[in-house]
Amino acid sequence: MTKSELVAQLASRFPQLVLKDADFAVKTMLDAMSDALSKGHRIEIRGFGSFGLNRRPARVGRNPKSGEKVQVPEKFVPHFKPGKELRERVDGRAGEPLKADEPDDER
């Protein structure tokens, strides 16, 4: 699902929201989540999962073209851990083929 598909689904589920308002709501939520993560905070959405940061230590890598050793600095990367309810809901689909173009509300 893309951000624009999420906006469209939000607008269709809540008829009082026009597409512009749904887009604003999604952008505001994503901005707030990005800001929290960039400040090192953890985000927990009960029943869905949590977002946090994982530290990747500095290491020695290789330049693929020259084979030269390159120092790769330490960095933090976003990480998502699904909650129990989400894991169970997804696990209920085990064995079903993945359908990339199937609308979510028809599942």
Swiss-Prot record:
Molecular function terms from GO: DNA binding; structural constituent of chromatin
Cited CDD domains: IHF_B (cd13836)
GO CC, alphabetical: chromosome; cytosol
Positions of the UniProt region annotated as Disordered: 78-107
GO biological process, one term: DNA recombination
Highest taxon above the source species: Bacteria
SUPFAM superfamilies assigned to the protein according to its UniProt record, in alphabetical order: IHF-like DNA-binding proteins
One of the Pfam families matching this protein, by short name: Bac_DNA_binding
SMART domains: BHL
Function in brief: This protein is one of the two subunits of integration host factor, a specific DNA-binding protein that functions in genetic recombination as well as in transcriptional and translational control.
NCBIfam families with a match to the protein in the record: hip, PRK00199.1
Subunit annotation: Heterodimer of an alpha and a beta chain.
Protein name per its UniProtKB record: Integration host factor subunit beta
